[in-house]
Amino acid sequence: MLNINIEKQFSQLQLKVNTQLPLQGVTAVFGRSGAGKTSLVNLLGGLTTPDKGEISLGDTLLFKHKTVNLPPEKRRIGYVFQEARLFPHYSVKGNLTYGMRHKTPELFDKVVSLLGIEKLLSRYPSTLSGGEKQRVAIGRALLTSPQMLLMDEPLASLDLPRKRELLPYLQTLAQELKLPIVYVSHSLDEILQLADHMLVLHQGKMISQGPLTQVWNSEQMRPWVPLQELSSLLSARIADRHPDYPMTRLLMDDGNQLWVSGQLPPTHKQLKVRIQANHVSVCTEEPKGSSIRNLLRGKIKELYPSDNGEQIQLKIALGKDELWANITPWARDELQLIPGKAIYAQIKGVTMTQMDIAESH
């Protein structure tokens, strides 16, 4: 485990985090601007020193107040910043091999292949696109043979086409490398595609931490997501494809099924499916003759009025999964919606795109 129990007073922020993070998969650190995300990873990497507490990575003590403070180069932690920070006078190959602990051709070839940078090795940073520079920066961090990788919003400085270019490489790294990654982001799109776990910060304090689906669907996330962006993550597996239409059927653990647009490639892995709360409607009886393909049976768990009172955020239990829906107070009153009531949730399959579906690692 990555054990964190630290405090640090910055000029406008007091950071205080006490938690344990798993040493496998990707842990996303999420929060608004100024929440302390970058400050936290700088403390983990040794770029900043806590005022008190301790940090340990597995059996290695990285920091303990007044007794231990390993410098960054001794922590065996790779760091990828928002900007690539490549050496302009070195070729791509020179940047990659800088700081390699062991000159092993096998590791070099594997990292270069995973990141798709074989054809860039003789080029210099000034000739690279933003996405290419970030791939090289990630490769350089991996070739130091780290025990953990810190990534501080590596896509933040890229435009949308470059983000789409780099994201598949990050997905491959997350799946192929047995290396814990702490990934800072304010983008829920990135977190959905990459993360297994999630830690939410607000004003320097941790307000939630745990498996991605659990945190994403939690009440603690609600205040930090705009009403129109509220969404749920459901777990499902590919069952089959429609024989006549470009649709794929997903099967949930509770027996409910989801039809999504497109013919997804076969996989035995569990999928994470994002459902926007604004795309969910509810009814108390099974509808007949509807164009909506997805009808999920569930029970109302909780109802939360929005801050402006114009909408109700409805939480629906679907076996072990939970689904959010935005409805009006009028609908709540007319349908007599209360906790424990059995209902049907309707979701249009065409509203779910490839960016709303990700494999669990």
From Swiss-Prot:
Domain of life: Bacteria
Membrane topology: Peripheral membrane protein
Principal subcellular localization: membrane
UniProtKB keywords: ATP-binding, Cell inner membrane, Cell membrane, Membrane, Molybdenum, Nucleotide-binding, Translocase, Transport
Broad enzyme group: translocase
Record's GO cellular component terms: plasma membrane
EC number: 7.3.2.5
All copies of domain Mop, residue ranges: 289-356
Pfam families (UniProt xref): ABC_tran (PF00005), TOBE (PF03459)
Chain positions recorded as ATP binding sites: G31, R32, S33, G34, A35, G36, K37, T38
UniProt xrefs under InterPro entries: AAA+_ATPase, ABC_transporter-like_ATP-bd, ABC_transporter-like_CS, Mo/tungstate-bd_C_term_dom, ModC_ABC_ATP-bd, Molybdenum_import_ModC, Mop_domain, P-loop_NTPase
Location of the protein in the cell: Cell inner membrane
Assembly behavior: The complex is composed of two ATP-binding proteins (ModC), two transmembrane proteins (ModB) and a solute-binding protein (ModA).
Name listed for the protein in its UniProt record: Molybdenum import ATP-binding protein ModC
Lineage, uppermost ranks: Bacteria, Pseudomonadati, Pseudomonadota, Gammaproteobacteria, Alteromonadales
